[in-house]
């Protein structure tokens, strides 16, 4: 009862990202503790607190995001590499940076005991993704060290707009190389992306060769694949019906994954290991009708177009994308971002889409789960 009241009080008086990070840590701690006991009543209490926290967090971001982008004391996607990764690099010991796409903080806390065993934790923090909380925006910003609008201006050939064909993250290695040059870091590095089991095995088998590099970057996409598959594959939807089940699925996957083998081998080889992500994800349950021109983007948690109409107040709308450091696809582009557990649907086939995407994991919007994500550094004892 006392903890409940203290948490409620802190939620109601949060007025900085750092305070929200501390609240999210507390909520996650209690959620994980309570999920281990079979008491739905208590679990529902912490869930209701998290729901209220997300409501207030959405309002906080709506009112303060422009200032957050200007605050040099806050670690964001486009400042993460310079502020957090570069200081960890050393010629004395190779560093393996593993970016697990779509890894939430609560998922990390479930994987943490196994991953940190036999190693010393030197950094165990949370940083904030920029919005939209998607791979295109967040991860390109991490590797470039630039905001999306800066990437578009400086490297227009490497930035694809919403409706351009082709992959949106095909130039991460090139963007990282350019960032290292810009920061004056003459280091040897390599970059790999694992999107299936075969590639995971291949990387594991040649990991020993990575010792010659000061920095090895590994983007591991499997958690993202689980998240996206949830809307398509019924058995995954059944396995990950809520956050508790989603964490369990993540842990089961990790314990049988090539990623676990890679981390174990990296420890044996004496690597310093950085573990982070580009954004998280949230279970969506509240449909919201949206309409726009024919070029409107497809993501369920944010939309951009020349003109957008939405029915709910659970959105953040901006008519000047540059104020959020975002490029404009058109002269009159605008963005809307879903808050809380909302997802956008069109009037065409409304009921079909509502049922298809209800209780699925989506990202791109504004929530604690999507924006506040782990950054961890471990090294040999």
Place the predicted regions along the sequence by residue.
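Feature captures the catalytic ectodomains and active-site-proximal regions of enzymes
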Residues: 1-381
């Amino acid at each position: 009862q006392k903890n409940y009241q203290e948490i409620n009080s802190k939620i109601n008086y949060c007025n900085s990202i750092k305070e929200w990070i501390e609240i999210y840590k507390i909520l996650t701690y209690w959620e994980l503790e309570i999920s281990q006991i079979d008491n739905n009543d208590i679990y529902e209490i912490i869930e209701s607190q998290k729901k209220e926290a997300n409501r207030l967090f959405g309002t906080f971001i709506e009112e303060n995001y422009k200032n957050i982008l200007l605050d040099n004391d806050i670690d964001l996607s486009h400042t993460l590499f310079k502020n957090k990764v570069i200081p960890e690099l050393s010629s004395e010991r190779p560093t393996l940076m593993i970016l697990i796409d779509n890894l939430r903080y609560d998922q990390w806390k479930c994987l943490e005991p196994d991953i940190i065993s036999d190693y010393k934790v030197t950094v165990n923090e949370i940083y904030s993704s920029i919005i939209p909380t998607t791979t295109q925006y967040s991860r390109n910003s991490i590797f470039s060290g630039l905001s999306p609008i800066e990437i578009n201006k400086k490297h227009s050939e490497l930035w694809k707009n919403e409706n351009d064909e082709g992959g949106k993250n095909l130039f991460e290695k090139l963007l990282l190389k350019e960032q290292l040059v810009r920061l004056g870091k003459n280091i040897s590095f390599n970059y790999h992306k694992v999107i299936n089991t075969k590639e995971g095995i291949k990387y594991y088998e040649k990991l020993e060769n990575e010792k010659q590099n000061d920095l090895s970057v590994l983007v591991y996409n499997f958690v993202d694949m689980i998240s996206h598959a949830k809307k398509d594959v019924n058995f995954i939807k059944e396995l990950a019906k809520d956050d508790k089940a989603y964490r369990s699925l993540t842990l089961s996957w990790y314990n049988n994954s090539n990623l676990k083998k890679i981390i174990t081998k990296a420890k044996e080889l004496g690597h310093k290991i950085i573990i982070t992500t580009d954004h998280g994800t949230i279970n969506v349950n509240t449909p919201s009708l949206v309409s726009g021109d024919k070029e409107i983007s497809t993501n369920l948690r944010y939309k951009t177009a020349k003109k957008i109409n939405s029915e709910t107040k659970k959105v953040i709308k901006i008519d000047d994308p540059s104020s959020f450091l975002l490029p404009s696809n058109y002269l009159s582009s605008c963005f809307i971002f879903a808050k809380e557990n909302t997802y956008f649907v069109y009037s065409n086939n409304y009921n079909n889409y509502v049922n298809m995407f209800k209780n699925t994991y989506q990202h791109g919007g504004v929530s604690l789960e999507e924006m506040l994500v782990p950054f961890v550094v471990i090294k040999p004892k």
